[in-house]
C-alpha cells in the first residue's frame, strides 16, 4: 500500500474463515492515518489472501462496525481492526 501521508501501525484481528485463510488470528499492518474503507478492505484482501470471502466481510474499527465502504477511516497508532466474515452454524 502506497501512502503519501503519515502512516500508523494497526492491529488486525481475524475471525472464523478469515482467520483460516490468513493463517493467523492476528497481525499488525501499516496503514495511512486516513483511508477509505474500500481501499483498506482491498489492501487487506490482497495482503492476507481473503479474495474468496471479500464480498461478505464486515470490518470493525475499535469495536465499531464500518457500515459504509465509502466512509473514510481515521487511524491512530495501535488502533484495532477486526475482519469478520458471516458466521454460519446451526
From Swiss-Prot:
The keyword Cytoplasm applies. InterPro entries: Beta-grasp_dom_sf, MOCS2A, MOCS2A_euk, Mopterin_synth/thiamin_S_b, ThiS/MoaD-like. GO terms for cellular component: cytosol; molybdopterin adenylyltransferase complex; molybdopterin synthase complex. It is found in: Cytoplasm. CDD domains: Ubl_MoaD. Pathway: Cofactor biosynthesis; molybdopterin biosynthesis. C-terminal thiocarboxylation occurs in 2 steps, it is first acyl-adenylated (-COAMP) via the hesA/moeB/thiF part of MOCS3, then thiocarboxylated (-COSH) via the rhodanese domain of MOCS3. It comes from the Eukaryota. One of its GO terms (biological process) is Mo-molybdopterin cofactor biosynthetic process. GO terms for molecular function: molybdopterin synthase activity; nucleotide binding. Keywords: Cytoplasm, Molybdenum cofactor biosynthesis, Nucleotide-binding, Phosphoprotein. NCBIfam families: moaD. Heterotetramer; composed of 2 small (Mocs2A) and 2 large (Mocs2B) subunits. Acts as a sulfur carrier required for molybdopterin biosynthesis. Component of the molybdopterin synthase complex that catalyzes the conversion of precursor Z into molybdopterin by mediating the incorporation of 2 sulfur atoms into precursor Z to generate a dithiolene group. In the complex, serves as sulfur donor by being thiocarboxylated (-COSH) at its C-terminus by MOCS3. After interaction with Mocs2B, the sulfur is then transferred to precursor Z to form molybdopterin. Involved during biosynthesis of the molybdenum cofactor. This is Molybdopterin synthase sulfur carrier subunit.
